[in-house]
Amino acid sequence: MFGAELVGRETGGQSTDQPYSYRDSARTWDTVTQSVLKAPGWEDSYAVITIEADKHGNGAHQETVAPSDLRQYAKLANASQILYAPLIFVTKLSIFLLYLRVFASARRGMTYLSIHLLIWFNLAFYLANFFLKIFQCIPRAKIWDSNTSGHCININIPILVTAAINVVSDLLMLCLPIICVWRLQMSIRRKLGISAIFAAGIFGCFASIMRLEVSVRDRNTKDPTYDWYTEITCGILASCLPALPTFFRHFFGKARTMLSRSRTRGSSNRSQDRSLEKATELYTLTYPRGQKHHIITDNRLIDQDRELDDDRTQIFSGPSYAVTEARVEGRTPLGQRAYHGDDTVLNGEDGSGHCRGILKVVEVDVESGPGHPTVKCRCDNW
């Protein structure tokens, strides 16, 4: 592990409990993303520097880093410090421009002036910070090689000033949109929801405050490989949070569409299955004489060549058969007169062959099955 590799080599025999080696960090050429390949920008250079610095002790305590790595790290750290000012300014500028578009589209009023004042103040401050980091040592080689003759400024003073101004700037950025939201004409519930989105920027404020506290407490210590990276990460996350509602609406909208399509397909399949299943239906009819007449329809698949001996039942021939039976309770079955498909009349009479006269006519539609014609059955009670 890291301790076993480093002890006795260049750390002066110091041991460490760190469970990994900073030299095993991801290399620059291992980190290739589609977005970087599509649209690389100058800000991507900061990521390249950071990834390269990881294998020279970035994020590890300085006492655990080899001297040769510290020299290389100092070069990369100075490059990242130079980029720090424009990077943090661009992060804040993106938030300020969002505020202008949302809250000051009319280009007048106190909100518009306040946002522009913050933009120009941050521009001036971070521009000065940019040149300060470039010329912090003369010659510049003294930044990473203390044996080089020359002089350097006390870098702790700019760090403290930068941390303090970042805290004030971040708090103003946090309060400004919330004040604007509560001046809008909308429901309390919606105001709370929008305020919660912008209030997520409090993570950046916490990072600035913690950086200021650590800078004041450890101003006499030197551990440049471990500090001041949290603030930039939190700032970038905070600047992306206002876009989360749009992302979630897009994501959940597609999820609802896919779920709806799945349910529609499932419903269609179940409907088709139910069309293949026909339950027995019982119709009860009351006649003027007080007699109950039951017409029972039931799906039965019967071979065409099969003959039924029961003369009480008429069979409709075809690919599948629907049996219709009519009888009066307590009496012998009544005759039936049925119209089947091509309106062919099937005569049904009582046992004597005499038709008693029609008391009630009932028409029943029986579907033989999917793809087969509907059978119309007309039952006459004599």
From Swiss-Prot:
GO cellular component entries: membrane
Descriptive protein name: SAT4 family membrane protein
Q: Does the keyword Signal apply?
A: no
Disulfide feature: none
Which UniProt keywords are present, listed alphabetically?
Glycoprotein, Membrane, Transmembrane, Transmembrane helix
- Family (UniProt): Belongs to the SAT4 family.
User: Where does the UniProt entry place glycosylation sites?
Assistant: N78, N147, N269
User: Membrane spanning segments where?
Assistant: 80-100, 112-132, 159-179, 192-212, 228-248
Location of the protein in the cell: Membrane
Q: Where is this region: Disordered?
A: 1-22
Topology of the protein relative to the lipid bilayer: Multi-pass membrane protein
Q: Which organism is it from?
A: Emericella nidulans (strain FGSC A4 / ATCC 38163 / CBS 112.46 / NRRL 194 / M139)
